[in-house]
């Protein structure tokens, strides 16, 4: 184990996979000479050269399509979106082509592509650069969607994503890039896609969160422990396919569930989780499932308004207390 | 299996080798007959969804494929039956696909607009206008990445030219010197909208020039006068160039939707099969049985 930042963990994953497999290459805006808008690809051009670290002009649809075409005939591209908000420009390529080629060609062609970059609320980046983009992708059959919370997950899940034979949407976070954590240096270390993790054991209530919301929920759990509430924290890590088994298992244990997500709540992750928990574990629930979500508005710029838009510790704590108080607790 | 003309050594211009001329005619006739049968089955309700026929444009696919090697790639939009047949796909498996059968090329999951055949390097079958052009650049990038000497032919219609991805793809292919041949089948109508109503520059080949891609306009109805992809073009692209071609072609059938009406302008365009000159002079020295030539004329 080594202690490193989330950014360094991603860089290590890219480097190891590029060393392991000559078909893996990186393509996107500023990934080479500039070494990445957020320095995730730092040093890759120097080690692997311009053949495998391809700088593109600003044309998300074009270079995503290039990645898909290259993947159809045997390469394994890692496409960087400078921020995932820009992936909307390539949404047609991702949804209509990458996600569907394997199916609509009757299995003749597959698209082993990873599309990665930061997304979600950051630091006053305002309406067009702060969206929780996962919702746009996890609805689509044929796509896998990953949101890695810790440096260790960032490395292990990115490596699995690159090794996957089908398209993976891998959304990081600007605010997590400098976060430090323990990361295995073993080049064979991977975390399988579709596996949730219990980050904190508890018995009174299950809280599901990922990315920045998980760090916030962790603080809430520590605070509430002082009040005698025992919170179990589950991080899905992969949103599609979702590890429903781990989530249901936790709900059967605690009988209460709160889902926290940074994005707007309507038809969000929390809606889906509440739905399958109700379908599969209705009799285990002692209280209605609660969702703590971002406000139903674009992200404002002003710092105080930005804070109002995203789920706060207070809101999370209040939801946890409500579900624990329901039905006599 | 369909006969492919892919392995023939083509000689550009009017001095077309009679053997090649015969194969070109065979490919064109195969496409014409396939499409006529598909139209019949569509009318009978045995083929569903959209059916975009290639009738009237056969010379482009036949001519272009004649200059390719079997291991070269072809990628197309949704009026792709002819490109897929010319590349050498099994017409029975293609028709099975149109019928939605499990023995179809894509196991019945793709249909008319999503024909793929990995065994002949036919990469589809893409039904969002313009979206497959960046894919072609990606295939070109992979060829260059691996240091191979294949080329990819990218067929598209005049309707794709107004899309941003046309320009993004040409820019990237030119910038990175990718072995892509862009072949525009300009039948002058994107569904019901004429190029005059859609493009500020209707000389489509000039867009290629803008990106520094050697480009030219050819007559897509003159299969032997100017083969759609001449061997010298292919070899130049193989050696690291790019190439753009805009073919004038005539689509005889209207668009692919049930109940699609042909506008007057569309209805009045022709749909004859261009018979290669050496064969058109039949029976004087073409070596072709009478039947072949006469059937071709019948199709005119």
Predicted region positions:
Chain A
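Thiamine diphosphate
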Residues: 1-167, 171, 175, 307, ...
């Amino acid at each position: 184990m080594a202690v490193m930042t989330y950014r360094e963990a991603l860089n290590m994953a890219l480097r190891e996979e590029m060393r392991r497999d000559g078909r893996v290459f990186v393509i996107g805006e500023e990934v080479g000479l500039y070494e990445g808008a957020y320095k995730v690809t730092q040093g890759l051009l120097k080690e692997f050269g311009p053949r495998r670290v391809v700088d593109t002009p600003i044309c998300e649809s074009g270079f995503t399509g290039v990645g898909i075409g290259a993947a159809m005939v045997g390469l394994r591209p890692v496409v960087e979106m400078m921020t995932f908000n820009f992936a909307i420009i390539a949404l047609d390529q991702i949804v209509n082509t990458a996600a569907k080629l394997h199916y609509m060609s009757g299995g003749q062609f597959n698209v082993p592509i990873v599309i990665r970059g930061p997304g979600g609320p950051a630091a006053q980046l305002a309406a067009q650069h702060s969206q929780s983009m996962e919702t746009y992708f996890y609805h689509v059959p044929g796509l896998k969607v990953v949101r890695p919370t810790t440096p260790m997950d960032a490395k292990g899940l990115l490596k699995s994503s690159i090794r996957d034979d089908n398209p993976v949407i891998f959304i990081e976070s600007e605010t997590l890039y400098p976060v430090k954590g323990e990361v295995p240096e073993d080049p064979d270390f991977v975390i399988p896609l579709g596996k949730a993790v219990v980050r904190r054991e508890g018995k009174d209530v299950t809280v599901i969160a990922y990315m920045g919301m998980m760090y916030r929920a962790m603080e809430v759990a520590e605070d509430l422990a002082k009040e005698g509430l025992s919170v179990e924290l589950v991080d899905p890590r992969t949103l599609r396919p979702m590890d429903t088994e781990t989530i249901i298992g936790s709900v059967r244990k605690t009988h209460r569930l709160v889902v926290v997500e940074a994005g707007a709540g309507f038809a969000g992750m929390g809606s889906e989780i509440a739905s399958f928990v109700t379908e599969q574990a209705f009799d285990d629930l002692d209280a209605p499932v609660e969702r703590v979500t971002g406000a139903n508005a674009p992200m404002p710029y002003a710092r105080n308004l930005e804070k109002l838009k995203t789920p706060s510790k207070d809101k999370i704590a209040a939801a946890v207390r409500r579900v624990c108080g329901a039905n006599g607790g | 299996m369909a006969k492919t003309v892919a392995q023939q050594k083509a000689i550009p211009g009017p001095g077309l080798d009679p053997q090649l001329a015969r194969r070109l005619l065979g490919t064109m006739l195969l496409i014409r007959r396939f499409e006529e049968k598909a139209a019949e089955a569509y009318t009978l309700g045995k083929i569903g969804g959209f059916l975009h026929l290639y009738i009237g444009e056969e010379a482009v696919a036949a001519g272009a494929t004649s200059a390719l090697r079997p291991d070269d790639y072809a990628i197309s939009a949704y009026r792709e039956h002819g490109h897929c047949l010319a590349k050498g796909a099994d017409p029975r498996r293609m028709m099975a696909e149109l019928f939605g059968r499990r023995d179809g090329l894509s196991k019945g999951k793709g249909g008319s607009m999503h024909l793929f055949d990995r065994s002949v390097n036919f990469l589809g079958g893409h039904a969002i206008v313009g979206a497959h052009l960046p894919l072609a650049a990606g295939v070109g990038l992979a060829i260059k990445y691996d240091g191979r000497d294949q080329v990819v032919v990218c067929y598209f219609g005049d309707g794709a030219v107004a899309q941003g991805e046309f320009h993004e793809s040409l820019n990237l292919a030119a910038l990175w010197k990718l072995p892509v041949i862009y072949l525009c089948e300009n039948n002058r109508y994107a569904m019901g909208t004429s190029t005059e109503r859609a493009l500020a520059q209707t000389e489509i080949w000039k867009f290629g020039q803008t990106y520094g891609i050697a480009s030219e306009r050819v007559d897509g109805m003159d299969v032997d006068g100017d083969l759609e992809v001449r061997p010298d073009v292919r070899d130049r692209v193989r050696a690291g160039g790019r190439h753009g071609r805009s073919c004038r072609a005539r689509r005889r059938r209207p668009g692919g939707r049930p109940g699609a009406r042909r506008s007057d302008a569309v209805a009045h365009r022709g749909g004859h099969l261009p018979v290669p000159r050496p064969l058109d002079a039949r029976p004087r020295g073409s070596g072709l049985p009478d039947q072949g030539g006469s059937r071709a004329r019948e199709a005119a």
